[in-house]
Amino acid sequence: MVLPLFRRAAIARTSSLLRARLFAPASEFHSRFSNGLYHLDDKISSSNGVRSASIDLITRMDDSSPKPILRFGVQNFSSTGPISQTVLAMPALSPTMSHGNVVKWMKKEGDKVEVGDVLCEIETDKATVEFESQEEGFLAKILVTEGSKDIPVNEPIAIMVEEEDDIKNVPATIEGGRDGKEETSAHQVMKPDESTQQKSSIQPDASDLPPHVVLEMPALSPTMNQGNIAKWWKKEGDKIEVGDVIGEIETDKATLEFESLEEGYLAKILIPEGSKDVAVGKPIALIVEDAESIEAIKSSSAGSSEVDTVKEVPDSVVDKPTERKAGFTKISPAAKLLILEHGLEASSIEASGPYGTLLKSDVVAAIASGKASKSSASTKKKQPSKETPSKSSSTSKPSVTQSDNNYEDFPNSQIRKIIAKRLLESKQKIPHLYLQSDVVLDPLLAFRKELQENHGVKVSVNDIVIKAVAVALRNVRQANAFWDAEKGDIVMCDSVDISIAVATEKGLMTPIIKNADQKSISAISLEVKELAQKARSGKLAPHEFQGGTFSISNLGMYPVDNFCAIINPPQAGILAVGRGNKVVEPVIGLDGIEKPSVVTKMNVTLSADHRIFDGQVGASFMSELRSNFEDVRRLLL
C-alpha cells in the first residue's frame, strides 16, 4: 500500500522566519536544515507500519550557544490496515508551555477540515490561542474532551482521516501516542491485570478491586504544587457524567471547580472535604464504571483504609514511649503548652477542633475528667506540689484559664501562604531602593470633576494614577524592565502592563491592565472594575493575573499618608500611593508675589529593584510621574 503524502507546516503563517514541510517516503531518515538564523531538526521514521514525523527542535543560531525556540507535538501516520490516519497532538504554542487546556472544540467529529481551519481553542500558560489544522481531511475522533485541563504537550488530542468513509474504522483510543511512554495525568484507569500500577503516596491493593479510575489532585495553575479540597459537590455513590463538577479546589490563586473527564460512579472519596495542602498528583477519589462495583470498593481492605493513610500526623509535642496512635493532626500552641506543663500524653487526648486540631479546651477537659494519661518522659519534670489528676480536677481548671492568654488559631488560605512565601523571598533576594515624592493633586482633581460634569464620565483618582504611571514607564523605558537572574541581565519589556493590588477575602490578588499606556482613562476605569469584581469572586483567568511589568498599591482610601510596598517578583518596581492631604504652601501668584495657598498633595513611594533602578533611573521616573500629575494633558499625548 502506498502511503499518502502527508505534509505539515512547521511554522504556520511565518514570512520572515522559516517554512518547512515534511515528507515520509523512506523508512527512516534524519535531516537538518538551517537558514543562518534558525535551525530545524526533524526526524521521520517508520516502525510496525506506523510512520511518525516530528519536528524536534527549532533553534536560534544568533549567539554562541543554540537556544531552543519552539518544540512541536507528534503526528503519527498509519499505513497499515484499511485506513490512513493522522494523530493530532497537543502543540507547544509558547516557548514555556508544557501543558495546555482544551477550552473549546470548534469542529465536531465527522466535520470536514481544510488547511487553516480552527480546530479548537487551547489555553496555554500565557493566553488562549486558536489551534489551526495543517492538514485537510475529516475529524474522525476527539480524544480529549472540551474543558480538559493540564494536557501535556505531545499528548494525542484528536484523530484525522483523509476519507469520510474511514471515520467508522478509527479506533476509540490510541496506544503509544506519546512514543509509547505512559504519562501520569489527573485521570488514570487502574485494572487488576495491569502489570504497572500508578505510584503515589497512596497505592491501593488493586488485586481485589474492580476496574476503576483514580482521580488525582490536578495542577490548576502553572505555579500550583498543592491545593485544598474546599468542597465535594458529589457524594459517594453518585452518578457522574463527563463535565460534571465533582468539587471545588482552592489553589494558590483562586478557588476553581474540578470537572470530571470520566463518566461512572463516585465510589470512594479518599481526601475529605476541608483537607489542606494536598500535593498535586495525590489520589483524591475513585470512580468505577457501574454501580455494582461501588460495594466492592467500599468493602475491600484497600478502599476502607485509604482515607486513614492520607492524613499526615506530625510528631507529638512530647515523647511517646508507646505505639498508641494520636487522635489529632495538629496541636494549637495553647494546647501544646498545657500538655508540657502537666506532663500529659498527647495521644491520649481526643481532638475536637477543625480538621482534627487538638485545642486548649480539649486538654482542659481531659485534665478535669482525669482521662489524660501521664507521659513517662515528663516524670522528672514534675513539681513536688503536683497532685494526682483525680485530686487536682477541681483546682487545675481555673488556674489554667487565669494563667493563659486567650487567642484563636486562624488557618491561612493557600493564596495567603503563597503571598507570604513570595514576599519573604522578595525582601531577602531583591535589593530594595526607596524613593519618595509629594505630588500636587489639584490639576488631577479638577480634570476629574470636568470629565464628570461636562462629559458624564466617572473615573476614580486611581484610574488616572494608573494612566499617569503607564505614561511615565513608556517615557522612561529603563524603568519598565525585570532582572534575569540566570543570565544576570536586564530585560526591557515592550509593553506596559500594570498590576493593580486588589484585596480579597482569601488574600491579595494582582489583576493586570495590559498595554495601559495605549488605553484611554475611561477604558482603564471599566477594565479595573471588571477585573476587581472577578478577583473578589475568585474567577480571574490565569492570563488576567500572571505577568505584569509594574505594580501599583493604592491605600489612599484609608487614613494612610505614606507607606513602602514590597516588590512583586519578577517585576522590578511597585508604587505605593497614599491619601491626599490639604497643606498650606507658598505659591507665586500672577502678580509675582509669593502668597500662602492651600493645595492638595499626595505622597507616592517607589520601591525599586536596585539592580535595575539606579538613582538616575528612579529619579527620572519620579520626575516624569510628577509632571503627569501637574499637567494632566500629558496623558493624552
From Swiss-Prot:
GO terms under biological process: pyruvate decarboxylation to acetyl-CoA
Residue ranges, compositional bias (Basic and acidic residues): 176-196
Cofactor(s) listed in the protein's UniProt record: (R)-lipoate
Active site: H610, D614
Stretches assigned to the Lipoyl-binding domain: 85-161, 212-288
Location (main, coarse): mitochondrion
Function per UniProt: The pyruvate dehydrogenase complex catalyzes the overall conversion of pyruvate to acetyl-CoA and CO(2). It contains multiple copies of three enzymatic components: pyruvate dehydrogenase (E1), dihydrolipoamide acetyltransferase (E2) and lipoamide dehydrogenase (E3).
Annotated protein name in UniProt: Dihydrolipoyllysine-residue acetyltransferase component 1 of pyruvate dehydrogenase complex, mitochondrial
Source species: Arabidopsis thaliana
Gene behind this protein: LTA3
